[in-house]
Amino acid sequence: MTHQPQQSPQFFLTAPSPCPYLEGQQERKVFTHLVGDKANEINDLLTQGGFRRSRNIAYRPACEVCRACISVRILAGEFEMTRNMRRVWSQNRDLIGRVHKAQPSTEQYALFRDYLDARHRSGGMSDMTVLDYAMMIEDTHVNTQIIEYRRRGPDSFMSAKGDGELIAVALTDVMADGLSMVYSFFLPHMQERSLGTYMILDHIERARAAGLPHVYLGYWVEGSRKMQYKIRFTPQEHLGPRGWQRFEG
């Protein structure tokens, strides 16, 4: 991880750039570095205030005219699967997720590249090298973990180990009040498994087991098709001018 000398957060504002979600809009972000002994505490507070983490930076939209980005968190304790979600959960019952320290591997990067090339070829992350990927995973001063999903082995119920190829990966921050899903990716040719949905369901179960009330999904952008999946996990809360407000869908 990189090291910065300051202990107190200093905030900065980016220059305007094209919005990746809404055509014709310009985005700006306010950001700070998450460093020092209080990085975990600051990350918790900022995430609860609508920030997201990328490497050792916490950021949130600060657009001049648009307020479409809305922070979303699932109420894990009240969540109930829909019929379709139960089907997804059942389809992936042969998978097991194992928690690791935030350390990259060549196997992870190969899966990451397959995912980007298939799903986000023209996106802002499409040219990430293996070094860029390693920095995305390792450059953190907060409580971050990697969850690797593999098929269950014959001794999985005793050892909690999966067997076989790597199928999906989630980069997750563990906070005082929940789990924050920073980034996730999966084998793109297994569309019938709905692995993105499955990993969110798995995080909800993990939050419940740990007694944590929330799963943070980042931003929902009304009008952006790629973000619509986030509001299917109800009940949830949306962050607005009056704080977190309940949303039932």
From Swiss-Prot:
Biological process according to GO: ubiquitin-dependent protein catabolic process via the N-end rule pathway
Principal place of residence: cytoplasm
Functional summary from the UniProt entry: Functions in the N-end rule pathway of protein degradation where it conjugates Leu from its aminoacyl-tRNA to the N-termini of proteins containing an N-terminal aspartate or glutamate.
Q: What is the lineage of its organism?
A: Bacteria, Pseudomonadati, Pseudomonadota, Alphaproteobacteria, Hyphomicrobiales
Swiss-Prot/TrEMBL keywords: Acyltransferase, Cytoplasm, Transferase
What this protein is called in its record is: Aspartate/glutamate leucyltransferase
Gene that this polypeptide is encoded by: bpt
The record's annotation in Pfam families points to: ATE_C, ATE_N
EC number annotated for this UniProt entry: 2.3.2.29
Q: Which family does it belong to?
A: Belongs to the R-transferase family. Bpt subfamily.
Q: Which GO molecular function terms does the record list?
A: arginyl-tRNA--protein transferase activity; leucyl-tRNA--protein transferase activity
Q: Does this entry carry the keyword Acyltransferase?
A: yes
Which locations, inside or outside the cell, does it occupy? Cytoplasm
The catalysed reaction is: N-terminal L-glutamyl-[protein] + L-leucyl-tRNA(Leu) = N-terminal L-leucyl-L-glutamyl-[protein] + tRNA(Leu) + H(+); N-terminal L-aspartyl-[protein] + L-leucyl-tRNA(Leu) = N-terminal L-leucyl-L-aspartyl-[protein] + tRNA(Leu) + H(+)
Carries keyword Cytoplasm? yes
